[in-house]
């Protein structure tokens, strides 16, 4: 049974830019850099990477469910650090870890290795936020979850695949 069988949809498909709409901008010269250049990212670019991730329970994107929002993306380019807050649809969401793993994995696959990425549950939005945050930001736990559990990796891959 779903934790949230009837989630609120904040953005409908017609008003939501798809990844394909943004694909041309990702292939522009702004993103074509030489190996020795530092590529600067902004909050919009990071948001564009995660907005189209689908929810593990519903055929909706994290943007449509208001799980990710551009104002919850924080970047410190000087330290190559990204902090992204996400808000589960209900305080008892059992999919929070999978959503967080999907966000982390999408960013890990998309960003240069120099970036440290922390994905955190928005404070006060989940009943087990400290436990979820601890698991999501422990490299060994994340690696173990993705490397040793083919079912978790399959779900994460399904969530982050481009539609």
From Swiss-Prot:
Which cell locations does it reside in?
Nucleus; Cytoplasm, Cytoskeleton, Spindle
List membrane-spanning regions: none
Q: Which Gene3D superfamilies match?
A: 6.10.250.1280, Fe-S cluster assembly (FSCA)
Q: What SUPFAM superfamilies does the database record attribute to this sequence? A: Fe-S cluster assembly (FSCA) domain-like (SSF117916)
For this UniProt record, the keywords arranged alphabetically read as follows:
Chromosome partition, Cytoplasm, Cytoskeleton, Nucleus
Q: Name one GO cellular component term.
A: nucleus
**Which InterPro entries does the record cross-reference, listed alphabetically?**
FSCA_dom_sf (IPR034904), MIP18 (IPR039796), MIP18-like (IPR002744)
- Primary localization class, coarse: nucleus
Q: Which GO terms describe its biological process?
A: chromosome segregation; protein maturation
In UniProt terms, what function does this protein have?
Component of the cytosolic iron-sulfur (Fe/S) protein assembly machinery. Required for the maturation of extramitochondrial Fe/S proteins. May play a role in chromosome segregation through establishment of sister chromatid cohesion.
What's the family?
Belongs to the MIP18 family.
User: PANTHER family, from UniProt?
Assistant: CYTOSOLIC IRON-SULFUR ASSEMBLY COMPONENT 2B, CYTOSOLIC IRON-SULFUR ASSEMBLY COMPONENT 2B-RELATED
Instruction: Supply the name of the protein.
Output: Cytosolic iron-sulfur assembly component 2B
**Organism (species):** Dictyostelium discoideum (Social amoeba)
Source taxonomy: Eukaryota, Amoebozoa, Evosea, Eumycetozoa, Dictyostelia
Q: Which gene encodes it?
A: ciao2B
């Amino acid at each position: 049974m779903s934790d949230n069988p009837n989630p609120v949809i904040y953005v409908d498909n017609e008003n939501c830019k798809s990844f394909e709409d943004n694909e041309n901008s990702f292939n522009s010269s702004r993103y074509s850099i030489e190996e020795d250049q530092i590529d600067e990212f902004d909050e919009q670019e990071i948001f564009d990477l995660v907005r189209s991730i689908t929810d593990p329970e519903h055929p909706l994107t994290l943007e449509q469910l208001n799980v990710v929002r551009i104002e919850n993306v924080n970047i410190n380019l000087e330290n190559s650090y990204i902090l992204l807050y996400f808000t589960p649809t209900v305080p008892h969401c059992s999919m929070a870890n999978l959503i967080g793993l999907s966000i982390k994995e999408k960013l890990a696959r998309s960003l240069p290795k120099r970036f440290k990425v922390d994905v955190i549950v928005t404070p006060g939005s989940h009943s087990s936020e400290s436990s979820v945050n601890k698991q999501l930001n422990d490299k060994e736990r994340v690696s173990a979850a993705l490397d040793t559990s083919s079912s978790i990796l399959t779900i994460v891959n399904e969530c982050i695949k481009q539609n």
